[in-house]
Amino acid sequence: MEERAQHCLSRLLDNSALKQQELPIHRLYFTARRVLFVFFATGIFCLCMGIILILSARSTQEIEINYTRICANCAKLQENASNFDKECTCSIPFYLSGKMMGNVYMYYKLYGFYQNLYLYIRSRSNRQLVGKDVKVRLNLIWYNTLFLFLNQVDFSV
């Protein structure tokens, strides 16, 4: 008979608050003091992060070198298909005014091209991005002229 009683007890559910789904409820009570504390603490945190970012941005050094016309001979050399095996080296000497600390990154800049602009998407050339010289397509001549015209117009009032 004892075995039967133990068998019945093992089939009963555990009497825990989790299994009986009687967990206590936790509710947030918003008071003016708590809301203002969180608001000002967030503001102070954002202010500190902004100061840190501004100070780190001031320590960067930037050098801009325009190489548009310096390496034009390489593009002319590669226009002729018979020169496919000839190498063209383009070097641009420049001098640094001081020592650069940390990592050095090099970027290039394109003027008048915006990635989300419809005309930029039409004018994108993967061959040019790889570094090969490309000729101007006829359907983009009007865009280039419009761009030159807009650069010459003075929009200031």
Curated annotation (Swiss-Prot):
Residues annotated as transmembrane: 35-55
Entry-linked Pfam families: CDC50 (PF03381)
GO biological process: phospholipid translocation
Topology with respect to the bilayer: Single-pass membrane protein
Coiled coil: none
UniProt GO cellular component terms: endoplasmic reticulum; Golgi apparatus; plasma membrane
Source domain of life: Eukaryota
Subcellular location as annotated: Membrane
This protein's UniProt keywords: Glycoprotein, Membrane, Transmembrane, Transmembrane helix
Cytoplasmic topological segments: 1-34
Primary residence: membrane
Residue positions the entry lists as glycosylated: N66
Keyword hit for Transmembrane helix: yes
Intervals, Extracellular compartment: 56-157
Similarity annotation: Belongs to the CDC50/LEM3 family.
PANTHER family referenced in this protein's UniProt entry, alphabetically: CELL CYCLE CONTROL PROTEIN 50 (PTHR10926), CELL CYCLE CONTROL PROTEIN 50C (PTHR10926:SF1)
Name of this protein: Cell cycle control protein 50C
Lineage: Eukaryota, Metazoa, Chordata, Craniata, Vertebrata
